[in-house]
C-alpha cells in the first residue's frame, strides 16, 4: 500500500490542477458572455474594436474581478478566516 500512496498523491494533485483549470475556463467564458452583452449592444462583433469598446470590456472585466474578490474576502471573514 505504501507504494500506491505516492501514485495516489500524484493523481490527486493532477485532479486538483485539472479542476482549477476547468473553473478558470468557466470563469473566462462567464466574463466574456457578460461583458459581451454589456459592451456590444447590437450583439455583433465589430470589424475593428474601437477605444470605447476596448475600455468598456476592460472596465467590465475589472469590475467582475473586483466583485469576485470582494465576495471571497467577505465569505472568508464570515467563516472566521482571514483574507
UniProtKB/Swiss-Prot annotation:
InterPro entries: Tim10-like, Tim10-like_dom_sf. Keywords: Chaperone, Disulfide bond, Membrane, Metal-binding, Mitochondrion, Mitochondrion inner membrane, Protein transport, Translocation, Transport, Zinc. One of its GO terms (biological process) is mitochondrion organization. Disulfide bonds join 35-60, 39-56. It is found in: Mitochondrion inner membrane. Belongs to the small Tim family. The twin CX3C motif contains 4 conserved Cys residues that form 2 disulfide bonds in the mitochondrial intermembrane space. However, during the transit of ddp-1/tim-8 from cytoplasm into mitochondrion, the Cys residues probably coordinate zinc, thereby preventing folding and allowing its transfer across mitochondrial outer membrane. This is Mitochondrial import inner membrane translocase subunit Tim8. It comes from Caenorhabditis briggsae.
Amino acid at each position: 500500500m505504501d507504494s500506491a500512496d505516492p501514485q495516489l498523491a500524484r493523481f490527486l494533485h493532477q485532479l486538483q490542477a485539472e479542476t482549477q483549470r476547468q473553473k478558470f475556463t468557466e470563469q473566462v467564458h462567464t466574463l466574456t458572455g457578460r461583458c459581451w452583452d454589456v459592451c456590444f449592444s447590437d450583439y455583433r462583433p465589430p470589424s475593428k474594436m474601437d477605444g470605447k469598446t476596448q475600455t468598456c470590456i476592460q472596465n467590465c472585466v475589472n469590475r467582475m474581478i473586483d466583485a469576485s474578490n470582494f465576495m471571497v474576502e467577505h465569505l472568508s471573514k464570515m467563516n472566521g478566516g482571514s483574507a
